[in-house]
Regions:
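Accessory nucleic acid-recognition modules appended to NTPase machines
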Residues: 1-97
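Short active-site-adjacent structural elements
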Residues: 85, 109-112, 141-145
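Domain-level recognition of nuclease-like catalytic cores that cleave nucleotide substrates
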Residues: 137-164
Length: 164
């Protein structure tokens, strides 16, 4: 069923970033609906809709920006510690990453902020030189870490940025 939805461009699957095709399929998977109305129609009422809508819009923008490359460049990343980075863009065949993106509705809660930053920090230690960004609803700034700076950008600004 999911393959048919992808073939019809109704939704897209995101797999774990791995050099092994088998491992990437077994370790993690997220599905993103192209039409957020479809997401709301098919998800349980308990789902946090705004958070999921923001994550979906970030994924669709990453996919739009990367449409010139190979299919599958935008992945998710399960870290050895069990933490997860929402999106990683890179070359799976060579095990290199260029962008690490976390999506967070708000970082007002210190535990949420620490969770998002620690996941990116761990990923930055595995992929030196990768740009790290946390996309939020309306917060901005920079967080300095031992592995480099993490940029915090509101979704509207991040979406409008010119990319190389």
């Amino acid at each position: 069923m999911l393959d048919a939805m992808e073939d019809a461009h109704l939704s897209y699957g995101v797999y774990d970033f791995s050099r092994s095709l088998q491992r990437s399929r077994l370790r993690g998977f997220k599905e993103y609906a192209v039409d957020t109305g479809l997401f709301y129609a098919m998800s349980p009422a308990t789902t946090d809709g705004l958070t999921r809508a923001l994550e979906t819009s970030v994924y669709l923008e990453l996919r739009r920006r990367r449409q010139t490359g190979r299919h599958g460049e935008v992945s998710m990343l399960k870290l050895p510690s069990g933490k997860e980075v929402d999106f990683i863009w890179g070359d799976e065949a060579f095990g290199t990453a260029f962008d690490l993106v976390q999506v967070c509705l708000s970082m007002d809660d210190e535990r949420t902020k620490a969770r998002e930053i620690s996941a990116l920090e761990e990923a930055m230690s595995l992929f030196p030189g990768a740009r790290a960004t946390i996309v939020t609803l309306d917060e901005y700034g920079t967080e300095a870490t031992p592995h480099g700076d993490i940029r915090i950008a509101p979704a509207w600004r991040w979406t409008l940025e010119k990319t190389a």
